[in-house]
Amino acid sequence: MPHAFKPGDLVFAKMKGYPHWPARIDDIADGAVKPPPNKYPIFFFGTHETAFLGPKDLFPYDKCKDKYGKPNKRKGFNEGLWEIQNNPHASYSAPPPVSSSDSEAPEANPADGSDADEDDEDRGVMAVTAVTATAASDRMESDSDSDKSSDNSGLKRKTPALKMSVSKRARKASSDLDQASVSPSEEENSESSSESEKTSDQDFTPEKKAAVRAPRRGPLGGRKKKKAPSASDSDSKADSDGAKPEPVAMARSASSSSSSSSSSDSDVSVKKPPRGRKPAEKPLPKPRGRKPKPERPPSSSSSDSDSDEVDRISEWKRRDEARRRELEARRRREQEEELRRLREQEKEEKERRRERADRGEAERGSGGSSGDELREDDEPVKKRGRKGRGRGPPSSSDSEPEAELEREAKKSAKKPQSSSTEPARKPGQKEKRVRPEEKQQAKPVKVERTRKRSEGFSMDRKVEKKKEPSVEEKLQKLHSEIKFALKVDSPDVKRCLNALEELGTLQVTSQILQKNTDVVATLKKIRRYKANKDVMEKAAEVYTRLKSRVLGPKIEAVQKVNKAGMEKEKAEEKLAGEELAGEEAPQEKAEDKPSTDLSAPVNGEATSQKGESAEDKEHEEGRDSEEGPRCGSSEDLHDSVREGPDLDRPGSDRQERERARGDSEALDEES
């Protein structure tokens, strides 16, 4: 059965995360927040904090003194043991009145006081620091198992304690209004005023505990508030994870803007004890307050420090962004400069190449004396142009960067030379004055020549570049040329023959011919072109070449066989024609004999008829011979053409003989 307690009983109170702490059951003041049912208002010695706990977490002091009354490392625990024995009626005392300006004043150093000072103000802080450390450590060591089971109960205990402390403060504030000189609005809103008057000063625990929020001097005794975590509290936080905060009310955030951040030595917030403060010998530890929600209770000073940190971070980010922008701008500038330099170098190289080409052409083209004179004239012009920069206009081919480089390179060499050559120049100054004019006249002539030659070379190069297209393009061009050359209206045989020759020289593959079947079709058609035999022969040659290249030596063998067969056929046809001509000749002779007998002509007439018959035979033989080569190859055609005039010659001799015979017969008749 849990023990029944009365106000004023001394007990050991157990709160999760802390050892059994020396405490006292408090009275419920009029107007104060009533504790929940089955819970007692507890006042913790050493820390002077309050909470609401059930009877199961309370143990009588006298019975459990030997068990739980051992010293502990927790700060505030040993002070609580001393206080429960020597000053069991210790309570919060009203601190002196605090104005709005006092909130800005630095807090008294908690380590400056001693236990001998019994003032109400000094006693509070001392008790807070001492009891907090010792009691918390003892409780943590002894009841770590019970801590795990009572997670939710701790939260419930802290909320009623919060309410009770608020009520106590309200009562104290109402009793001490005259002393504190606080406005009635502050009395009514005790909770808000206590929150607004909390400080941001934090003391760091050298041991495992987080810093405690120190109390501010104010009309209402505030409770210790949990500090907002700072960078320096990382160690204390890490340690306090295992050990829960001491039995204290839940921390509250500073809601009013009237509270200003204090500029104490430590830039961290400290919890506020409820009723009084006492300078502690040790730095204030984080007492019994739990840390369920550290984000909620940032005080005005912590918010200021956070804002300062945010400002620093924002300034750092701005600086980084500015640096990045500067670096990017520099990189862009460097890239642009590099591109410009590369372009300038390319231009210079192009100009140098042009100049070299022009000079080489000029040296090649300029012959004998004229070239020598121009060179002799150019050398002094260059020298003078280097010495006097603005006198002679530079040629169009000279590039500016080259001139600058030459000038800079030869300045140093000319300075010592100028002193030695000045006396030698004086007598021949007139000649030099006359020479520049001649040089200027000769220079444009040379420039024009070089320009013309460069234009000619450029045209030739362009033509060469244009003539370098692929085989397919050449095929298509030649095909179009052949078509245009063999127009019905105005055929151009020479152009067609040239195109066919080029087509025959092309190295054509089967793939190209498969793509361009029109070319093969046109060649087949041109083989039958009757208007000109040369075109026919050339087309046949090109066609056979293409075939031989594409299909290989097999077709050549087949073609040879075909040619041999054709030649045999032609020979047989010739023999048949000759036999027919031989048979026709005796028939004609037989016919001529009866005709002579019947007609009985004169000698001259008979001879003339014989001559005509002979001529007819010869003409028939000539026709037969002409028909033969037509059916034959192109070589036979050439032979027949050559033999044509030879066939006419015997005919003409016979005509002359017949004329001579006719003349002789006429003379005989006259005689």
From Swiss-Prot:
What are the alphabetically sorted keywords of the record?
Coiled coil, Cytoplasm, DNA damage, DNA recombination, DNA repair, Isopeptide bond, Myogenesis, Nucleus, Phosphoprotein, Ubl conjugation
Recorded GO CC terms: cytoplasm; nucleus
CDD domains of this UniProt entry?
Answer: PWWP_HDGFL2
Phosphoserine: residues carrying this PTM: 114, 137, 165, 230, 232, 234, 240, 266, 305, 366, 369-370, 395-397, 399, 454, 458, 490, 625, 633-634, 640, 652, 664
Lineage of this protein's species? Eukaryota, Metazoa, Chordata, Craniata, Vertebrata
Biological process GO terms, please? Answer: chromatin remodeling; DNA recombination; DNA repair; DNA repair-dependent chromatin remodeling; muscle cell differentiation; muscle organ development; positive regulation of cell growth; positive regulation of double-strand break repair via homologous recombination
- Basic and acidic residues bias locations: 138-150, 195-210, 234-244, 310-364, 423-473, 565-577, 586-595, 612-664
Protein name per Swiss-Prot or TrEMBL: Hepatoma-derived growth factor-related protein 2
UniProt-annotated stretches for the region Interaction with DPF3/BAF45C isoform 2 = 470-552
Cross-link Glycyl lysine isopeptide (Lys-Gly) (interchain with G-Cter in SUMO2): where in chain: K554
